Amino acid sequence: MMSSDPPSLRFGQVVIGPPGSGKTTYCRGMQEFLSRLGRKVVIVNLDPANEGLPYPCAVDIAELVTLDDVMDGLKLGPNGGLIYSMEYLEANLDWLENKLKLHHDCYFLFDCPGQVELYTHHNSVKNIFAQLSKWNFRLTAVHLVDSHYCADPAKFISVLCTSLSTMLHVELPHVNVLSKMDLIEQYGKLAFNLDFYTEVLDLSYLVEHLSADPFFRNFNHLNVKLAEVIQDYSLVSFVPLNVQDKESMMQVLRTVDKANGYCFGDLEERNLQAMMSAAVGADFQFSTTLGVQEKYLDATKNHVEDEVMDL
């Protein structure tokens, strides 16, 4: 039986995103970063496919169910096995509650599976997050996306659609993160300045750039409508991140703390100046993005918008 008496307020992040986006690396980096700031951090691994974890794990779903056991026992593939594992966890939430009760006055990082369908179409993960909220967790969904997708307009529109769908389905305060900023131009230069992608500015320019490709020109009407849906909701924006960069990590942390209310919570002493700074957004997002662009983008290459201005 799950307790009807919820514990005191607890804060944390649920780290989601497609496979290979850097969720586990982010959890390890954020744990080290928060520990240096004096926060007591607990990592909860909710990914049954995670093996050889690079961080100390306080709660591990592998004690309850593993993907290999599910695939072998039920003859399921990787996707079906992950869905079954999440349904099994949902049916055994008392196990998770008892594990979490052992950790008091901690900040929680939940390392989640990478299957996109779990956050856009299936309800088990959504229900697990909802139950965590009932247990007095104040969580922010940190959705990691590979930054190099910005170099491909078609992939970036797909990323925007996935991010929007996830935000609407998961129903948590949401921070979208462009991860691996040090590799952003690995597969080609960006067509626009970085703030165009982080703030998701006028997508009609991106659609025009996409229609220059003969293949995608055939799908121009579809791309226009997808861009309209994204901009009509006006929900998606991104925070750039390089886990090795302390300033970048601090920017993400500030955004997350505002989203879940940690900066106004009672887990540690916060002075009035820090709270007011968070409330008015005194970290100036534009200046931060400009600094990231200067650090990671090749300044010798002209962007499309620069070339247009030169005409």
Swiss-Prot record:
Assigned keywords, A-Z: GTP-binding, Hydrolase, Nucleotide-binding
SS bonds (residue pairs): none
Residue numbers covered by motif Gly-Pro-Asn (GPN)-loop: 77-79
CDD domains, sorted: GPN2 (cd17871)
Record flagged with keyword GTP-binding: yes
Record GO terms (molecular function): GTP binding; GTPase activity
Function: Small GTPase required for proper localization of RNA polymerase II and III (RNAPII and RNAPIII). May act at an RNAP assembly step prior to nuclear import.
Subunit text: Heterodimers with gpn1 or gpn3. Binds to RNA polymerase II (RNAPII).
Similarity-based family: Belongs to the GPN-loop GTPase family.
Protein name (database record): GPN-loop GTPase 2
Organism field: Danio rerio
Gene (name only): gpn2
